[in-house]
């Protein structure tokens, strides 16, 4: 006999290998820790269980044990509280790589699809490509000075990206690579009251610092003091809310956490788990994830991440990328919504995002011109929308808004509808909540 591994299954051994400086506060708040490449990372907090009664209509329990395994309705409550006020997320498992030296900008231009030659204090989102034009990485870059760039990549992507960058490093001494991942900790602060929270404690040159969008726009990076702690604030969001990623040295982390928590008390600030950051908040915005939507067999055009113009500088995968831009895509990333999730037995089911097949209305497989089968890459609740969503690549003929399809889950077909084609999200499609 053999066991079937749940897509969200957690390791039972070799735990507690890496802890953020916030661990004691998180443990006291009843964090349910998941493993993230050795890091203990909160998925949800039992201290937020009281919010279920506040948002009860959006926090239904899942009746089937398999669907409910490694999940909690607390996640939906945390999601809605953050959308209503403000939440703080432990992002210490991020990987941070510093590139410095006179050749740093030229090197990163060659590695990255998008233009990294931005002003100091600005940032850029960019994929990394394979020579064949598929996804090799997905990251953001902050320009901290003329010859200092900081690359931010995901918890599970650091080893791969570290290798890829080092493999292509020039050997003339013009670029220095420093892995800062074990030196820095990170807190995400997001929500309508994030600005009010941070305005109380952020200073620059020992005086109040204006954190408004006018002075501190989306994508900007600033060096500040927060509760006396030197920090790098980066205005960006992966959950579709106004706010920042805040970076500081590990030894300052606990004071930073306590300063933000105290400042946000009057707004009902809560700790928020990765169930919101990595699933519900992300899927409402249709954001792609490396290793899920972004894989080497798909390209930026298919993922809806191609930009209107391509930089003149050469980069890895450029020829293949230019060719893909000229051709009709074989597949398009889409957002699907479940129409009816009741099984034949009358039980509400919730696909886990474990590569469930997407089929035609008549139950036939959807296969693109390259032989790739349509499947669910991410699935999760969208509490702000009252929907259950999935992301999947579809062929152009099926990638039509309103088109009805089927998802196979536990050998049963459930009706789904194409809600969005491409990168436009269902939630806040103009990004007003993040950028105004």
Feature roles, as predicted:
Residues 1-436:
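Glycine/proline-enriched, intrinsically flexible loops and inter-domain linkers
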